[in-house]
Regions:
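Conserved signature/switch motifs of ABC ATPase nucleotide-binding domains
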Residues: 42, 63, 95
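H-loop/switch region of ABC-family ATPase nucleotide-binding domains
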Residues: 103-104
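ABC ATPase "signature
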Residues: 127-128
């Protein structure tokens, strides 16, 4: 049950062997970048699901990765919290961060992606630029999925 700040500092000091002062400076910078600097001393029980997810993003960014993998980052969130996490991810994309995102948030995928891969049964069914895949999918299964999605949206 570490604070948000310690959650971002510890991986840097343990894995990267960064000096604690530098790790803290980097952690605070990234907590600020995801709108969580005011919660640096908060513990998990004091944070909403969306806030916890943003701390997790700050922790990952504190390690200064080349790529970040997001596996359904909004699936366990209340609907009200989804937007705040997607907004942080959108800013990351705009900053040039390479992200691999597994998501059912189709509007987000269409708006933010350079490349989209549609998987069906664990196999790549179709891939392409968002305009191609969402605008004129080639595979029947992709068309079926997207038509269902568009009806629900």
């Amino acid at each position: 049950n570490m604070t948000a700040l310690e959650n971002c500092v510890r991986p840097q000091t343990v894995v990267l062997k960064r000096p604690r002062a530098e790790a803290k400076r980097i952690a605070l910078e990234h907590l600020d970048s995801v709108g969580m600097s005011a919660f640096a001393n908060a513990r998990p029980s004091q944070l909403s699901g969306g806030q916890k997810q943003r701390v997790a993003i700050a922790r990952a960014l504190s390690m200064r990765p080349d790529v970040i993998l997001f596996d359904e980052p909004t699936s366990a969130l209340d609907p009200e919290m989804v937007g705040e996490v997607l907004e942080v991810m959108k800013k990351l994309a705009q900053s040039g961060m390479t992200m691999v995102v597994v998501t059912h948030e189709m509007a987000f995928a269409r708006d933010v992606s350079d490349r989209v891969i549609f998987m069906d049964g664990g196999v790549i069914a179709e891939e392409g630029a968002p305009e191609e895949l969402f605008g004129s999918p080639k595979q029947p299964r992709t068309r079926e999925f997207l038509s269902r999605y568009l009806r629900q949206a």
